[in-house]
Amino acid sequence: MKRTYQPSRIKRKRTHGFLARKKTAGGRKVLKNRRRKGRWRLAV
């Protein structure tokens, strides 16, 4: 059986990266909440 996690830097950045978050309203909300919480890392 193939494992579910097949790491790929490109996929990682495209789906969870900062620019991907910035693009959508929901993503911007995520960034806002993470900033407010004081997360050391906002996006991947």
From Swiss-Prot:
One of its GO terms (biological process) is translation. Residues 1-44 are annotated as: Disordered. InterPro entries: Ribosomal_bL34 (IPR000271), Ribosomal_bL34_CS (IPR020939). Gene3D superfamilies: 1.10.287.3980. Keywords: Ribonucleoprotein, Ribosomal protein. GO terms for cellular component: ribonucleoprotein complex; ribosome. One of its GO terms (molecular function) is structural constituent of ribosome. The keyword Iron does not apply. The keyword Nucleotide-binding does not apply. Pfam families: Ribosomal_L34. HAMAP family: Ribosomal_bL34. Belongs to the bacterial ribosomal protein bL34 family. This is Large ribosomal subunit protein bL34. It comes from Thermosipho africanus (strain TCF52B). The lineage of its organism: Bacteria, Thermotogati, Thermotogota, Thermotogae, Thermotogales.
